[in-house]
Amino acid sequence: MLRLFNTLTQEKEIFEPLGDVVGIYTCGPSVYQYAHIGNFRTFIFEDVLVRYMRFKGYKVKRVMNITDIEDKAIETAKTEGKTLRDLTEYYSGVFFEDMKTLALLDADVFPKATGHVPEIVKIIKKMMERGFAYRGKDGSIYYDVSKFGDYGKLSHLKLHAGKKKIKRDEWGEDTSIISDFALWKSYEKEDGEVFWETELGKGRPGWHIECSAMSSKHLGKRFDIHIGGVDNIFPHHENVIAQNFGAFGENPSRYWLHCRHLMIDGRKMSKSAGNFYTLHDLTGKGYKPMAIKYLLLSMSYRKRLNFTFGELEESSRKIEKLRLVIERLKKTNGEDDAEKIVMKAMKKFELAMDDNLNTGKALKIMEEFADEVSQIEPNKVSVEKILETFRSFDSILGLGLF
């Protein structure tokens, strides 16, 4: 029985789907820079969730948005002398190549924010009609946080009053303030050619409203799971809940899942701190993509993971050992019966995954299983059962063992 830790309730809850198809919305990449391996820790966790749900027989529809309009993207395009479209298409292409390199499954839909402006306008109008949004003196349209009594329940923070209104996508160093936030940003000359002429006026969408528009279009007003990194909890996901309540009267998602940070030398890996590695950085040093993936799965997504090259070397050795065990098995034709070993390993693996996708424990179980089968000479039937068990593990973890 699958249990997932719900950020909203701060409890592990039995997963109960809302309908026949499990709807999952992923906050995808902001495509103004290369994604680093800390970003990919979250995307790998999400990939494993989808794989495991399908393994358990669920039908899944996964939507991963592409954030191709935001303050930082506009600023970066201007600095690099590129159009916003050229910039975001380049980094989107790199991201998709990285996904393939890491053997991540494609989402069912990859919606772009720039392709959903009509939906964004419609939702904002609905919020204005319902009294949750207003036009500021600067011409921008803001969400009135005072109208939503549950604001702050996702983040569980002690929030305090900040500025009356915040127009920028990010709120600076202070991430525990209550402020009205921009849904539609009125045009400024710094925006250059990035604007839309709509019934809301000349301008562009705020960052938070994009996810409300894309999730509701592709998954409906209410779906099963909303996923992201812990940095998304506040203000982004808090604001998404507020927006959806303002437009539709309900929280969009039943379960909210968030992946913890990847650390490096005890500090959060981030673009702003400049202490990050991209997939290309590490493969350029000779490390194989699946070893990197193995390391990123080596601890539960609910715990911080500290990246070191020593741990990466160890992950390289572990995955190579698994491959050698599998290759040896393909040539084995002994007399030992491995049915009990297989059944025990599969049961333990599923228990670990059912416990909030504990991939760290699942990897250890797979390693122990490899050690056990290495000590016997299984017969032909047992060899097939062992290999099938490894295939099941691999179909869930996506490590390319076959």
Predicted regions and their residues:
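Alpha-helical recognition segments enriched in aromatics with Gly/Pro capping
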Residues: 1-32, 47, 118-328
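N-terminal, positively charged nucleic-acid-binding surface of large information/translation enzymes
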Residues: 9-103
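Short catalytic-loop micro-motif centered on adjacent basic/acidic residues
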Residues: 62-63, 108-111, 226-228
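Short, polar/flexible loop-turn hinges at active-site or ligand-entry regions and domain interfaces
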Residues: 80-86, 107-109, 304-306
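N-terminal, positively charged, Ser/Thr/Ala/Gly-biased leader segments
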Residues: 97-131
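Structural preference for alpha-helix termini/caps and helix-kink/transition segments
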Residues: 276-402
